[in-house]
Swiss-Prot record:
Name of a matching Pfam family: PseudoU_synth_1
Entry's EC annotation: 5.4.99.12
Name of the protein this chain belongs to: tRNA pseudouridine synthase A
CDD domains to which the protein is assigned, alphabetical: PseudoU_synth_TruA_Archea
Keywords assigned by UniProt, alphabetized: Isomerase, tRNA processing
Record-linked PANTHER family: PSEUDOURIDYLATE SYNTHASE, TRNA PSEUDOURIDINE SYNTHASE-LIKE 1
Substrates-to-products reaction catalysed: uridine(38/39/40) in tRNA = pseudouridine(38/39/40) in tRNA
Function field: Formation of pseudouridine at positions 38, 39 and 40 in the anticodon stem and loop of transfer RNAs.
UniProt family annotation: Belongs to the tRNA pseudouridine synthase TruA family.
InterPro entries in UniProt: PsdUridine_synth_cat_dom_sf, PsdUridine_synth_TruA, PsdUridine_synth_TruA_a/b_dom, PsdUridine_synth_TruA_C, TruA/RsuA/RluB/E/F_N
Residues binding substrate: Y103
Enzyme class: isomerase
Gene Ontology terms describing biological process: tRNA pseudouridine synthesis
Length: 262
């Protein structure tokens, strides 16, 4: 087996689908084209975290049943630098043990009360019943109790950056936590501490809406396995994101001009 550290920019959903246009499908097809993977083994055996379309990743993992170590620049050339990167790989005998997952959300700063958000986030840290802050997956029966290790919040003129650390998360759990903290920062919730206590209880069943997927990135899935990063692929990833940043900064300048002149 080989474990791969992968990154992607959110344009695609993650898990293998019949239409073949997902992160896993793209990587499987690249490995098949290079002759490293048999068609019967095209579905990954393991992944570090299933993400929805719109969510990016810098440190997700997938595992394939294969015998030959791949040359990553060759695999990456098959991916055509189109929003999916295979950063590193390593041969393994057993599945990795996950220590924690680290998600980050960049929220537009619209005069939020950041200190109030920080205070409220402390009530979410620890082991709680998070069913009301998740999307119910009717196809699976999952324990809604999860443990958050830490939440860090920082801000600048444009963004509020929220980092969330935990061993595992329910479907849409991070995005709903972000929406809750954002609404608290906008003073939309009268008594934040009391409401958090209510929404983390089994007596509450109304749920809570999620924030948009586009602001979320899976920064890392920390495991007991260290994977060496290919310097060439990493450089290509940085070049791609720098290009996106430059385009976004130009767009930001245009937006500021229009808003200041109207």
């Amino acid at each position: 087996m080989y474990i791969f550290k992968i990154a992607y920019d959110g344009r695609l959903s993650f898990q293998t689908q019949p239409h073949g246009e997902t992160v896993c499908d793209k990587i499987s097809n690249a490995l098949l084209d290079c002759g490293y993977l048999d068609n019967k083994d095209r579905v990954p055996l393991y992944h570090g975290g299933r993400t929805d379309r719109g969510v990016s990743a810098l440190g997700n993992y997938i595992v394939y049943e294969m015998d030959k170590k791949p040359v990553l620049p060759r695999v990456q050339s098959k991916l055509k630098w189109d929003g999916v990167w295979v950063l590193g790989c390593k041969e393994i005998d057993t599945f990795p043990e996950i220590e924690y997952r680290h998600y980050q959300y960049n929220l537009p700063n619209k005069n939020h009360d950041v200190e109030l958000m920080k205070k409220a986030s402390e009530k979410l840290i620890g082991t709680h019943y998070f069913q009301n802050l998740s999307k119910r997956d009717k196809s699976k029966v999952k324990d809604p109790v999860r443990t958050l290790y830490n939440i860090k919040i920082s801000s600048n003129d444009y963004f509020i950056t929220i980092d969330i650390f935990g061993e595992s998360f329910l479907w849409n759990m991070v995005r709903r936590i972000i929406r809750l903290l954002s609404d608290i920062g906008k003073h939309k919730i009268k008594d934040p501490e009391k409401f958090i206590e209510l929404i983390l209880s089994e007596d509450y069943s109304k749920g809570y809406p999620p924030s948009p997927a586009e602001g979320l990135i899976l920064v890392d899935v920390k495991t007991n396995i260290d994977v060496d990063i290919d310097s060439y692929v990493l450089r290509m990833l940085k070049n791609s994101w720098e290009k996106s940043l430059n385009n976004s900064l130009m767009r930001l300048g245009l937006c500021k001009t229009v808003l200041s002149k109207t």
